[in-house]
Design a protein with these regions (language model features):
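Catalytic machinery of carbohydrate-active enzymes
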Residues: 1-239
Length: 239
């Protein structure tokens, strides 16, 4: 509503602030209603999927919903190799859709990993993420779930503005994410970006469509992601 309609139908209103994180914007509704803020994300609960590894493992979620949020096949393989070299079983997650499965078949062809794509419900996925030593994924819902589950989370961001849509760390966000930085960290979340002058553009890829590539992601170096991954893993699993 706006103008006279807002006054006619709403007892109280707050102005939309599109410059703050979306979680913070929603928490402001609680302030207006006099409800104490709870900045902790409550994730679904469920048991581990039957095929979950018994030893230490890492989770990679390589397939976002849209092409313009995809990284590179070579990048994902490099990260998986780095995790395996640190003694971690690599678990690949993903949805059941045909296009997503085809992309993951391409990414993980010939790889010695545990594939759980299409085999976890949300509760099982949440439990899996809570047990993982580290999670690496693009800007997608599972990345936000990993952050909420308390997993050390490495998020690969391209066109999306982390100031508005960055993963929300356990315990809340102590200060705003920067628009662009090679690596930035708050709590259990690390955001990795390739610093193009146009990043973050908030557009659907360089060709302005869901199926286009984003140069800021395609040029994101595996070494940069692996460096953030090592920070997230901590000293005991670094090389």
């Amino acid at each position: 509503f706006s103008g006279r309609l807002k006054k006619a139908f709403l007892a109280r209103s707050i102005a939309a602030d599109r410059s703050v994180h979306r979680v913070e914007a929603l928490l402001r509704l609680a302030d207006v209603l006099g409800i104490p803020r709870v900045g902790q994300v409550v994730v679904p609960q469920g048991g581990l999927p039957p095929a979950a590894p018994s030893g230490p493992f890492a989770v990679i979620h390589a397939a976002p919903m849209f092409t313009y949020k995809q990284w590179t096949v070579e990048g994902w393989r490099s990260v998986a190799a780095a995790l395996a070299a640190r003694g971690l079983t690599v678990v690949a997650t993903g949805g059941p859709g045909e296009a997503e499965r085809a992309y993951l078949d391409l990414v993980w062809k010939g790889s010695d990993i545990v594939r759980l794509d299409g085999r976890c419900n949300w509760g099982q996925l949440s439990s899996l993420l809570a047990r993982a030593k580290v999670y690496i994924g693009p800007d997608t819902s599972v990345t936000h779930l990993a952050a909420g589950a308390g997993c050390p989370t490495v998020a690969l961001y391209g066109p999306t503005d982390p100031r508005l849509w960055g993963p929300w760390p356990v315990g809340g966000l102590p200060e705003a994410w920067l628009a662009t930085a090679p690596v930035q960290n708050h709590g259990n979340v690390w955001i990795v970006q390739h610093a193009f002058p146009c990043t973050p553009c908030q557009l659907e890829g360089c060709e302005r469509r869901l199926t286009s590539d984003s140069a800021c992601l395609k040029q994101l170096a595996p070494a940069q992601v692996i460096s953030a991954m090592e920070q997230a893993l901590g000293p005991s699993l670094r090389q």
